[in-house]
């Protein structure tokens, strides 16, 4: 009998999330325990999600049942930079549903979060995973696990046929696919197959629960929300990125050193990423715009600062596939270290299935708007066009980024 792709519970436990939510949560506990934030859900495909509201609400209510077990806490205790006070807090943590609002507005599903950053930060990944899987249960209920497995092995065959043994030995790939996965069981199977059969170097997953299950190190550092929040936390807007990086450095003392560049734009980021930060951080993460142009720009920045790019790593995570990863790898190989975090194309690539394009983004911090502009016009996110205009003015951001792939 074929194995079902759907488990009874969509979100398995509190660790069924991306690792960077925990690393940011610790930094919030230590630095911003009283900051209030707002988040909003957006579906980028024109898809009617209203029929799924009741089931989404049911699954969301089950989040409130989750808490960390002694074994799960003991796994986190082995991660040296997670501090005892944070782990004690996590041991007591429960999802508080009073901060979450769902319903229908203007003919569309809405999901909003409003509350203390410390208490809403963990909602994002499980909420997106719930929306994705609930929708897939309705639309693709006949799907079986074998379809996902076969599709993954077809990708391995392509990679083996198109990359040399030497290239494969250096091609580092990680799973970043929790939030838009087809289902938990599909992600579990994909990560298990990657660990045992990937022809390149599988370096791990961002999913903390699956890292624990497969005895691997969870991967991740920071997300856009960390830099976005500082737009309303720092003394001056122009200093907001520096404030975000400074706070991260104080929290982690050189650990977790991959910085995200495109919250405003990479040009604006590199203007703040001076010799101090460039020496201290291990590398940079790409999440929008032309990846090879971005890589060239980062290499040039390190050279300008007198830093050997081969001592640094670039992590790519923007809508990647294995062919796209191989193309980027070949373009930059031997000049800087590269690694690839692949999400939807691993955990929601099944023949006949259309993956969702959904996000849940911070829209306000302490009652004031925050924004992500990014290196790609379609990825700008802000409720307040006046604030976006002000942000562009302060950081001298042109209408089209120098890294936009849509030029």
Curated annotation (Swiss-Prot):
One of its GO terms (molecular function) is nicotinate phosphoribosyltransferase activity. InterPro entries: N/Namide_PRibTrfase, NAPRTase_N, Nic_PRibTrfase, Nic_PRibTrfase-Fam, Nicotinate_pribotase-like_C. It catalyses: nicotinate + 5-phospho-alpha-D-ribose 1-diphosphate + ATP + H2O = nicotinate beta-D-ribonucleotide + ADP + phosphate + diphosphate. The modification Phosphohistidine is found at residue 224. Its EC number is 6.3.4.21. One of its GO terms (biological process) is NAD biosynthetic process via the salvage pathway. Pathway: Cofactor biosynthesis; NAD(+) biosynthesis; nicotinate D-ribonucleotide from nicotinate: step 1/1. Pfam families: NAPRTase, NAPRTase_N. Keywords: Ligase, Phosphoprotein, Pyridine nucleotide biosynthesis. The keyword S-adenosyl-L-methionine does not apply. Transiently phosphorylated on a His residue during the reaction cycle. Phosphorylation strongly increases the affinity for substrates and increases the rate of nicotinate D-ribonucleotide production. Dephosphorylation regenerates the low-affinity form of the enzyme, leading to product release. It comes from the Bacteria. One of its GO terms (cellular component) is cytosol. HAMAP family: NAPRTase. Catalyzes the synthesis of beta-nicotinate D-ribonucleotide from nicotinate and 5-phospho-D-ribose 1-phosphate at the expense of ATP. Belongs to the NAPRTase family. This is Nicotinate phosphoribosyltransferase. The gene is pncB.
């Amino acid at each position: 009998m074929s194995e079902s792709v759907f488990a009874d519970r969509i979100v398995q436990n509190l660790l069924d999330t991306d690792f960077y939510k925990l690393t940011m949560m610790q930094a919030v506990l230590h630095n911003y325990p009283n900051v209030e934030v707002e988040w909003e859900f957006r579906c980028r495909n024109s898809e009617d999600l209203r029929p799924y509201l009741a089931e989404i609400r049911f699954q969301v209510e089950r989040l409130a049942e989750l808490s960390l077990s002694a074994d799960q806490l003991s796994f986190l205790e082995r991660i040296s930079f997670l501090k005892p006070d944070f782990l004690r807090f996590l041991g007591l943590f429960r999802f508080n549903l009073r901060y979450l609002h769902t319903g229908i507005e203007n003919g569309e599903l809405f999901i909003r979060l409003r509350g203390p950053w410390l208490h809403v930060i963990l909602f994002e990944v499980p909420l997106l995973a719930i929306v994705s899987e609930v929708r897939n249960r309705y639309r693709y209920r006949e799907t079986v696990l074998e379809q996902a497995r076969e599709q993954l092995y077809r990708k391995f065959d392509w990679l083996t046929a198109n990359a040399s043994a030497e290239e494969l030995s250096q091609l580092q790939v990680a799973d970043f696919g929790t939030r838009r996965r087809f289902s938990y069981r599909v992600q579990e199977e994909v990560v298990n197959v990657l660990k045992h059969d990937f022809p390149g170097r599988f370096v791990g997953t961002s999913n903390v629960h699956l890292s624990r299950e497969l005895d691997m190190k969870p991967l991740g550092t920071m997300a856009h929300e960390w830099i976005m929040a500082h737009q309303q936390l720092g003394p001056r807007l122009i200093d907001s990125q520096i404030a975000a990086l400074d706070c991260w450095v104080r929290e982690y003392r050189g650990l977790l050193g991959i910085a995200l560049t495109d919250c405003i734009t990479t040009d604006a980021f590199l203007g703040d990423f001076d010799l101090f930060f460039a020496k201290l951080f291990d590398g940079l993460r790409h999440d929008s715009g032309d990846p090879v142009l971005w890589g060239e720009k980062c290499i040039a920045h390190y050279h300008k600062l007198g830093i050997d790019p081969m001592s640094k790593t670039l992590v790519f995570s923007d809508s990647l596939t294995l062919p796209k990863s191989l193309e980027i790898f070949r373009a930059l190989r031997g000049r800087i270290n590269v690694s690839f975090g692949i999400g939807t194309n691993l955990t929601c690539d099944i023949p006949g299935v259309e993956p969702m394009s959904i996000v849940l983004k911070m829209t306000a911090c302490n009652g004031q708007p925050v924004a992500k502009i990014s290196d790609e016009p379609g990825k700008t996110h802000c409720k307040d066009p006046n604030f976006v205009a002000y942000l562009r003015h302060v950081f001298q951001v042109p209408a089209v980024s120098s890294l936009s792939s849509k030029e």
